[in-house]
């Protein structure tokens, strides 16, 4: 699913809610569900835009490193099989 809102927009929505706008009204006004709002609040609550961008960058880097680790572990297992198979 394609993201419709940027981190900057999401933080803006959260700030509107903090300023006193009812969640249902905020969701209706901007066209997203209250479930999305509460998910965003759990993830971005209290953050500034720069902090949200940093979080996103760290999540991307974490995913990349996990993939590299998994590939390295597979390579190690393959090498163990080759070494055990030699006379």
Swiss-Prot record:
Listed name of the protein: Insertion element IS407 uncharacterized 10.0 kDa protein
Domain of life: Bacteria
Cleaved signal peptide residues: none
InterPro entries: Homeodomain-like_sf, Transposase_8, Transposase_8_domain
Keyword Protein transport: no
The entry's keywords: Transposable element
MF terms in GO: DNA binding; transposase activity
Family named by the database record: Belongs to the transposase 8 family.
GO terms of biological process kind: DNA transposition
